[in-house]
Amino acid sequence: LSPSMKIFSGNSNRQLAEKICNYLDVDLGKLNISQFSDGELSIAFDENIRNENVFIIQSTNPPAENILELMLILDAAKRASAKTVTIVIPYFGYGRQDRKDRPRVPISSRVILDMTVGLGADRIVSMDLHSSQIQGFVNVPFDHLYSRMALFDELKKMNFDEETGVVLAPDVGSAKMSQAYAKSLGISFALIDKRRPKANQAVVANLVGDLKSKKVLIIDDMIDTAGTICNAADAAMDNGAISVTAIATHPVLSGPAVDRLMNSKIDKVIVCDTIEITDDKIFDKLEVISVA
């Protein structure tokens, strides 16, 4: 570990930052984040970072305030003469808005990355991007990490085999990620053709694959409102599955997600700690694996 490395955390996921520092056997840097009476953020590094290699850890959920906080921390680091600044974004908010899918809309993920690079980020690190092609939006190194390595030990304990196990992709977008899990586990692969009548609403159109008498593993990059993954679980059980386990890297868990998951046909929900989970979103089926 370089002696010139310093790690700092925003407010979004300090627990993960502390775990990373414990793993690396370094102290988490001193960064003061407070608010003025009108709600404006006040950012100040409480230690010298001149000529240091600075890493800033900040997930962006909820996105608006945490993205602004990240940009202000980045600007403060550059103005404090850090040698390099690496932005570590375990969960990249606005990652789903990666193209113009209808007239008169922004490409929001490009806007966020333009701000990040414009303020001087030297490198960006993120995990299980919803759309990996957004790496091409910037001309600085953009490292795309995968949670699969952290989750694989847990999956091995579940004894999936070629005869009884199948990985089910809940939509076409998650097919590549699901196929990687299926290959690693040596089990078969199935796919759901999902349609979206409107935002945050998904319906199952078709299911391709044999799920009869199988233990089903549903893989996705995130659980937002949980509609997609719960519909996939219903489809799996309707097609003869004997159990359903859901795995997602990012526990966004917005709106009705927790209630849906608690009352779903899913036996276990495994997520990572890329987003800090508040106490009101903890439920019996939930298991959290650290990616630190």
Regions found by a protein language model. Name each.
Residues 1-292:
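PRPP-associated nucleotide enzymes
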